[in-house]
Amino acid sequence: MSRICQITGKKPLSGNKRSHSMNAKKRKFFPNLHNHRFWLDKEKKFINLRISKQGLRLIDKYGIKKVMEKIKIKYKNV
């Protein structure tokens, strides 16, 4: 569970590593995850999230407030 983005839900993918002679060897493709701290004005506190670069771009585009509201709605339905 530690290699999952908390915003987008991206997980490691499996595939093949190919050598020059096209021999296949199993490998994993990991998302570009980073630990990042965000300030929430509404709650007056910091939160720590483990997010992918795509998740960070979503936060830059829409703002942490909208993204957090969408996440809470997503987790309430499950």
Swiss-Prot record:
It holds the Pfam family Ribosomal_L28. GO terms for cellular component: cytosolic large ribosomal subunit. Keywords: Ribonucleoprotein, Ribosomal protein. One of its GO terms (biological process) is translation. Residues 1-23 are annotated as: Disordered. One of its GO terms (molecular function) is structural constituent of ribosome. It comes from the Bacteria. InterPro entries: Ribosomal_bL28, Ribosomal_bL28/bL31-like_sf, Ribosomal_bL28_bact-type, Ribosomal_bL28_sf. Belongs to the bacterial ribosomal protein bL28 family. NCBIfam families: L28. This is Large ribosomal subunit protein bL28. It comes from Wigglesworthia glossinidia brevipalpis.
